[in-house]
Amino acid sequence: MQTEIKFRWLLLGSFLVNVGNSFIWPLTTVYIHDQLHQSLTVSGIVLLFYSGTNVIGSYVGGRLFDKYSPQRLTLGGIVAAVIFMGVLVFKNDWPTYPIMLALIGIVNGWLMTMHNSYGARMRSRDGRFVFNMLYFANNLGMVFGTTIVGPLYQYAHDNVGPLFLVTVVMYAAFSLVVIKFYQIAVIKRPQHEEKMVKLPRANSQLIWTMSGALLVIWMMYSQWSSNMSVYITGHGVSMTSYSLLWTINGLLIVALQMAINWLNRRMNNDHLYLYFGAAMLGLSFLILPFAKGYGAFVFSMVVLTLGEATAIPTIPALVNQLCPMEDKGRYQGIVNSFGSAGKALGPLFGGLVIERFSYQPLFYVCTLAILGVGLVSWLMIEKNHRQAEYY
């Protein structure tokens, strides 16, 4: 049996999972507030639970990937997604909608970790290239999904049932791809190594540092997809123009991944991507207190995207180098769960800072937090990378 799947099928899977995921984020707040007549606070709590269950799905999926058939686990996740979304096709009132959304959160976290773990198993391609292209596929799925979800929602007369029907059909078709192309061998451990391989201390410290860095980065980054919409529209920018910022983000990521793949063939220091990315992410927030017009917000988004495209896919690639083949899934699950936790906590954290102080202090806090993450990562890498064992 083959030890890795064809790369194109892995990218297709990642793309489709993120198309499905992108149907949830843009509409949940509007649907819960306007159609289910709940408060914005309740909408925020529902999204918090959705991201929180992502953490559970990511962690559990990663642990199981190393022990059981990855194909069956992925197929099980797709079947569960079809069932939960199928319920929402016919019954999407309160409280069915938030309950099903929390269950879908588990499945989406599970499927994201499955794809990252499949990528971590690949030996025919460079790890940096694999994770850069996975990130590219993720974002392409998000851009495609968010582009079509608005018109579909309007066409369905503000009913989410048809949207979930589209997702059910898409996932059902994807299950056929998984059945045919996602079969890889389960790595059998020697009987005396049934327990998890003990990593060198330097490896463990670097993995936890990278995971913590991803949590903080996503906490700060998620301000853009949550609290920043209110801030930007409050400066006289329309919702259409705000949405255009995300189109710019998606197109830039597509272009940047091609440039990064070219750089990867000429540069052999992955850590530099993390340092550069953290610096750009921090700088993007430092621009915001001085932003007076739409052009400044576009500039900040461009700088943010430079940081995002270099730092965020680098972290799972670095972790992949630091863990053995038989534990790839577990550690990718940990990294994904930290990222999901950051996405869950970010909007709440930002809201509390804004409520207590204002937007300006939030921007400075985000700048300092991300630059601090870059500094701590640099110190830990300098301390441990020579003693670390690379797999």
Please provide the spans of the model-predicted regions.
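Juxtamembrane intracellular "pre-TM" segments in multi-pass secondary transporters
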Residues: M1-E4, Y182-A213
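Helix-loop boundary and gating motifs at the non-cytosolic
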Residues: Q2-S51, L206-W246
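Hydrophobic core of transmembrane alpha-helices in multi-pass small-molecule transporters
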Residues: F15, P95-L111, L215, A296-T310
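Residue-level signature of mid-helix packing/kink "hotspots" within the transmembrane helices
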Residues: S51-Y59, M142-V143, G250-M258, K343-A344
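Helix-to-loop junctions at the C-terminal end of transmembrane segments
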Residues: G57-S69, Y153, L256-N269, I354
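Structural signature of the two symmetry-related core transmembrane helices
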Residues: R72-V87, L272-I287
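Cytoplasmic helix-loop-helix junction between adjacent transmembrane helices
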Residues: A102-N138
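Symmetry-related core transmembrane helices of the 12-TM Major Facilitator Superfamily/SLC fold
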Residues: P162-K180, F363-L379
